[in-house]
Amino acid sequence: MRRTAVEKAEFIDKEYREYLRSSYSFGNDKYQDLYEKRLNEEELYKGPFLHMSMPFKKGRSLNQLIDKNIVDSDFRKLGNIHLNRTLYLHQEKSIVKIADKRNIVVTTGTGSGKTECFLYPIINEIMKEKRNGNKEPGIRAMFLYPMNALVNDQIDRLREILSSYPEITYGSFTGDTPENYKDGGTREKFAENNGIASLPDNELVTREEMRKNPPSLLFTNYSMLEYMLIRPKDSVLFNPENL
């Protein structure tokens, strides 16, 4: 049975009171009655609070931006990208401004597609580089996240987008990243352990791989970045020829 927001709040309140009621028994009728009375009278939570927001303004679609030569036509080779779906206006503006070599700061609401504001322009710039003949390995963009869970979420998303575009490599360098396949098993074993049906060739999964051929897109966290900057064996990632 589906409940409204108010009904859900009332259900949670009722269940929580039942939990508290069943968790404490005083063995004294007077104290038990007093406890029951206070439990029924007390306000155990605030709310629910409802927040209304207007829909975000719509912009042009990726296909329209491709037709205007703002976005590279190789975007049509990517997976899990809706080329004809209209972008939000702030997403379109981000793509256009970065394509025009301008800096941006994105401040917009939850669920408004902030990731696309930086991910699409970065992929677009790398595609343009490769079209102009720059196909050397090296880090083109670094993504810093406070938690490994967020890194993993983005890697899962990139795996869908770039699986059919092997020219752009990517990888995550965190505490969970194995040093080599001896530590993490084979690529097939890594895929199996992480519930991945097929691991794309352009996803680098070991530290050795990334030191040998730095990925175009590197995902890490603040703490690991500090270690990478001071460890001699990781310095190869940041050599000028790899940036």
Please name every model-derived segment:
Residues V96-I104, E116-E136, R157-R159:
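Walker A/P-loop NTP-binding motif
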Residues M1-K93, I168, E192:
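Helicase-associated low-complexity/disordered flanking segments
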Residues P215-Y227, S235-L243:
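SF2 helicase catalytic motif II
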Residues D100-V106, P137-A141, P214-S216:
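Pre-Walker A (Motif I) flank of P-loop NTPase domains
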Residues T108-S112:
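The conserved Walker
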Residues N180-L218:
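Conserved motor-coupling elements within RecA-like helicase/translocase cores
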Residues L87, A197-E203, Y227-D234:
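Short gly/ser/thr-rich secondary-structure transition/capping motifs
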Residues E116, P137-S163, T169-K182, M224-Y227:
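Conserved Walker A/P-loop ATP-binding site and its immediately adjacent core
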